[in-house]
Amino acid sequence: MSKTRLLEGPLRRSLLTSIARRLENVVKNHQRRVKSVNISVFGFSRGAAQARAFVHRLYEIAEVWGSGCGYNVAGVPMQLSFLGIFDTVASVGLAGISRVSDGKWDWAAGEMMSIHPEVRQCVHFAALHEQRINFPMDLAASGREALYPGMHSDVGGGYSPGAQGKDFVDGKADGTAKLAQIPLIDMHHEAIKAGALLKTMEEIRQDSIRAQHFGCHPQLIRDYNAWLTGHGAGGGAHAEQIRAHCRQYVAWKGMRLWNGEGSLLQQPFFKQADGEDQVDLANAQRDFANLVRNLAQGKKDMASYRANLAEIDDRIEVGRRMGRPVFVPVPRASQEAYDYAKIPAETSQLLDLVLDHAPVPEASAVLFDNYVHDSLAGFYIGTYTELNIPAVSTYGYLRYRGVFNIAGRQRQECRDPSSLPPANVPDIGTAFQQMGAAMGGF
């Protein structure tokens, strides 16, 4: 570790503590008294990673007070009531597309991506179908975590209505039919329950523009509920569920790969996409077809190569038993066979789903066709997508998403107030404890 990194923590804490002290003087000398601070933090993607890191940094400079179960900043009692985050992706420094990095540099390193134990309630909504190699996701080892169908931005938002021909109702793009509407409304509900000072749904409905942003089309609700009861992917640990749903998505990609009426290029969503999206989707389809074709040929060649080696071994064994030397030229494997031999086990497994025409539940196919976007097709790294970037084999759709699960620290035990420095016990602690009790207690 460099000297700069060794000094970074103390220097940062010194700077932030100095700012907190100046802020404390402002608070003390102001005629309006700040009795407590109740904090809610929200974030999506790298913003969710920053939200996690922000909470850790905040508690670096917070001081313990009262019974040792609370904290203050600038002499004011604070409570971090709610952390609402969508599909946490750090990718700090060299992203996951580099073989020498996991994207966990600087402020995303160590336990910084864990959920701080002083967060009263954490809710994390994670995407089931994202595959991009430079979008590894941090699960929430504590708090409440829910898995939602779709890609990264199908959960956290970001796709415009009608992007890639999705979210259409009666032939027209409809923002209330986006998959992201469901986790948005669910997060709003969880935040309100936790005491976050947001507008209620009743207040939102009184404003036509806000009401539109929080709308959820009956068609989406119907298809989403059908998927919930019909996907058949099973339960289990969240990392395993993500893999199970990835397999189902890859099977659907395979179903849409072959020529004929089932081809992706013949689907309504492709035909109603705009020209640029059609180019991206068609290019991704071509790259996927080439990958499957090359790996399928490599699998076939490798099987033939191994069969030839087995036959040679048999002939050599027969010659040995008969006391005769056997000279047989050793066959060479094709380049495709060598390439196939190097692929990860997960890629081989997912390839077989495509080659075997694995079935896809109808409810899942409806969701994939009409709502789930293709993040690999539309995400460019320079002038390339992950599917065709030179000299890097990511295996595109034939891979699982990277998932991290960092546990972090346990919440501290409460301490006897007499053991704490007097300066850390604000005289307005009683009011904050009463507020905490009203919100569900400490």
Identify the meaning behind each predicted range.
Residues 1-442:
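Active-site- or binding-pocket-proximal scaffold segments within functional domains
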